[in-house]
Design a protein with these regions (language model features):
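Internal hydrophobic scaffold segments of catalytic domains
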Residues: 81-140, 200, 204
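Helix-turn-helix
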Residues: 4, 8, 16-46, 50
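Helix-loop segments that flank and shape redox-cofactor active sites
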Residues: 65-74, 106-109
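Alpha-helical structural segments
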Residues: 4-11, 46-66, 82-89, 100, ...
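Charged/polar positions within long, soluble alpha-helices
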Residues: 64, 92-100, 186-189, 216
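C-terminal peripheral helix-coil segments that are non-catalytic and often amphipathic
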Residues: 124-218
């Protein structure tokens, strides 16, 4: 029944948006009294958290599979592009799930700790690819632009937790590049390419390679 509740909630999010998610509406769709649904999800936020965790786990699994399917010998750029392309394909197939986790925050909702590890899965794949690229000599770690000290401090914490051995310069490029990947996906899904780019597949393929080279070259 938990899966049926979440499926009904996902349909409601697709129809009216996450901010309008209602346990009463979900219970009506399933023919349940609302008090019965509360035994599974005590609040709207609890149900919303379950949907968010599922979405992050789904896109994380997609990224992990894409990485695993490209031999390390093919190099950094091929692996990065494969993961970026797989994440975009998932987003195109599941636009409402993508919007739930990468779109505008839901007013009044504060994500609990339960969402942190699922949310990190895609980022950890990207950082692993970058670490391997550094070790293989595919990424030039030299810096050509001074970095503000506060940024060094923040990146040091990230490196210690998730990217040992990756220099601040390369971490900064990685954050910028992955932001560009998600930005390209969002521009496509939210209609901002309308009237500008017709061939979304070709455009994203180009963007994926450009973001890889943003990381590999100083």
């Amino acid at each position: 029944l938990t899966q049926e509740i979440k499926a009904a909630a996902r349909r409601q999010v697709a129809d009216v948006g996450a901010s309008a998610l209602s346990l009463r509406a979900v219970s009506r769709e399933l023919g349940m009294v609302s008090s019965a649904l509360y035994r599974y999800f005590p609040s709207r936020d609890a149900l919303l958290t379950a949907l968010i965790v599922d979405a992050f786990d789904a896109v994380g699994a997609v990224a992990e599979r894409a990485e695993a399917e490209v031999p390390a010998a093919e190099g950094f750029e091929s692996r990065w592009v494969a993961v970026a392309t797989a994440v975009r394909a998932w987003a195109v197939a599941n636009p409402h799930d993508y919007a739930l986790v990468y779109g505008s925050p839901v007013p009044g909702y504060e994500a609990p700790r339960d969402t942190v590890d699922p949310a990190a899965r895609v980022s950890l794949v990207a950082l692993r690819i970058v670490g391997d690229g550094l070790a293989a000599g595919d990424i030039d770690p030299r810096s050509t632009l001074p970095m503000p000290r506060p940024v060094h401090t923040e990146l040091a914490a990230l490196r210690e937790e998730a990217a040992p051995g990756v220099p601040d310069e390369v971490l900064a490029r990685t954050l910028l590049a992955w932001s560009a990947v998600l930005g390209a996906i969002s521009y496509e899904l939210f209609g901002h390419l309308h009237g500008i780019i017709a061939d979304h597949d070709a455009y994203f393929a180009h963007q994926a390679h450009r973001t890889a080279r943003l990381i590999s070259a100083p």
